[in-house]
Amino acid sequence: MEVLYSISKTLKDARDKIVEGTLYSNVSDIIQQFNQMIVTMNGNEFQTGGIGTLPIRNWTFDFGLLGTTLLNLDANYVETARTTIEYFIDFIDNVCMDEMTRESQRNGIAPQSDALRKLSGIKFKRINFDNSSEYIENWNLQNRRQRTGFVFHKPNIFPYSASFTLNRSQPLHNDLMGTMWLNAGSEIQVAGFDYSCAFNAPANTQQFEHIVQLRRALTTATITILPDAERFSFPRVINSADGATTWYFNPVILRPNNVEVEFLLNGQIINTYQARFGTIIARNFDTIRLSFQLMRPPNMTPAVNALFPQAQPFQHHATVGLTLRIDSAVCESVLADSNETMLANVTAVRQEYAVPVGPVFPPGMNWTELITNYSPSREDNLQRVFTVASIRSMLIK
């Protein structure tokens, strides 16, 4: 894997900087590294493809070295270099695609394609290593079963979940009280509602709670908390739990009271925030508990009082909500996040070449299913294919 990254980094630098008119002295280090790569690769043969519709291709290496000059690089020099660079880039692209289409239930962190296994051989260690990539650094740690750490921005840590629970209901669905939520990606939105606006509740207050368990623990997370759940702020028709009917939800938004957010790790409370909104931090957690209250306003203008009558029909439904968004965090496991295209790159290659469903990944690389059942085997394989996708993205956009 380190060799694959180092070759790609060398090719990227060469493609960007070996241009006509450049002084040789300005790129001599790159050219020397480029020549070392050629010397190491010459005389070797590789084969890629042969899975799904990814075609089998054979690769041979027999390239001349780039020479030295005291002058600027001329068109002939650059053209010779470009021919070699383009062949190597095509090779790296196919090695990466081959690797991204393969999976294994055992030791999925290790190279799975024949080409990458061969590149892991001792003879290729002469290629100048560049391990500056976060993915390469973590791949090395994971390969040795040491603790890894990925920095994510808006990590897709929450499997998609959208539903509701009713604490009070009737066959006519005309006086309901309960909770509805939408968890997806890096965001939780949860709303508590009461058609009667807590009129018959103790102290005219309804208590709501929403607990979310993460599939992987996060550390040093920066989080935004807002006293609103905008996705539940407009009327909608909702299917009943048994699917036999539908019911009408027409929210009127109130501010939540006594808001408390707890972050827990293995059942132990690590951080607690009460009535605090905006940016907060959480040190280490695998569970989030949100609790909040809906309180019937003790004083109301006639217009507000008309919204919340003391008897049916209840045409407007008192609603309070919270939004929790994970803006950034560190995780020991690889995840998809908003700043990267690794999941899209891997999925696109597997779809384009009709890769059959294997023993590890779900059909279509369905992220909700993948993160819901995030086994050690999936973690190993995902880290490997994301590492390869990050290498490929240096050369192929």
Curated annotation (Swiss-Prot):
The protein's location, in the record's own words, is:
Virion
| One Pfam match | Rota_Capsid_VP6
Name the InterPro entries on file. Answer: Capsid_hemagglutn, Rotavirus_A/C_VP6, Virus_capsid_a-hlx_vir
Please, which domain of life does this record's source organism belong to? Viruses
Residues that bind Zn(2+): H153
**What are the alphabetically sorted keywords of the record?**
Calcium, Capsid protein, Intermediate capsid protein, Metal-binding, Ubl conjugation, Virion, Zinc
GO terms in the biological process aspect are: fusion of virus membrane with host plasma membrane
The entry marks the following residues as binding Ca(2+), namely: N266, D286
Grouped into one coarse class, the protein's main location is: virion
Single GO molecular function: metal ion binding
GO cellular component terms, A-Z: viral envelope; viral intermediate capsid
The protein's matches in Gene3D superfamilies, at most eight in alphabetical order, are given as: 2.60.120.170, Viral capsid alpha domain
Q: Where is this region: Interaction with the inner capsid protein VP2?
A: 62-73
Per the record, the similarity remark reads:
Belongs to the rotavirus VP6 family.
Quaternary structure note: Homotrimer. Interacts with the inner capsid protein VP2. Interacts with the outer capsid glycoprotein VP7. Interacts with the outer capsid protein VP5*.
Protein known as? Intermediate capsid protein VP6
